[in-house]
Each structure stands twice: as structure tokens, then as C-alpha cells.
UniProtKB/Swiss-Prot annotation:
GO cellular component, one term: extracellular region
Keywords in alphabetical order: Antibiotic, Antimicrobial, Defensin, Disulfide bond, Immunity, Innate immunity, Secreted, Signal
Taxonomic classification: Eukaryota, Metazoa, Ecdysozoa, Arthropoda, Chelicerata
Gene Ontology terms: biological process: defense response to bacterium; innate immune response
InterPro entries reported for this sequence: Defensin_invertebrate/fungal
Signal peptide residue numbers: 1-24
Cited PROSITE patterns: INVERT_DEFENSINS
Annotated disulfide bonds: 26-45, 31-53, 35-55
Protein name: Defensin-1
Entry annotated with the keyword Glycosyltransferase: no
Amino acid sequence: MKAIVVLLILALILCLYAMTTVEGACQFWSCNSSCISRGYRQGYCWGIQYKYCQCQ
């Protein structure tokens, strides 16, 4: 029973996360932290409707 509850909670979290990311658009905080974790100085969003993440 606990496993089912945990799976339902994870599914809800993933669903909410998908709703906050607008059609794959770049999210600054996610892009920036991803770039920093890979050893870059910062990350920024660019392109039409800021769709792409660029590390520098």
C-alpha cells in the first residue's frame, strides 16, 4: 500500500512540474543551475520565445 501512495505522489509531482514548464521553454533557474552544476559560470535563455538554454 505504501508503494502505491509513493507512486501516486511522484506522478502528481511530475505532472505539476510538467505544467510549470511551458512547452519545453527554457526556465532560467533550471538552466542556470544546470550549467553551474556542469562547471560553467552561468546559464541563460535565448532564441525565439527564449526556448534554448546556453551555458557560458
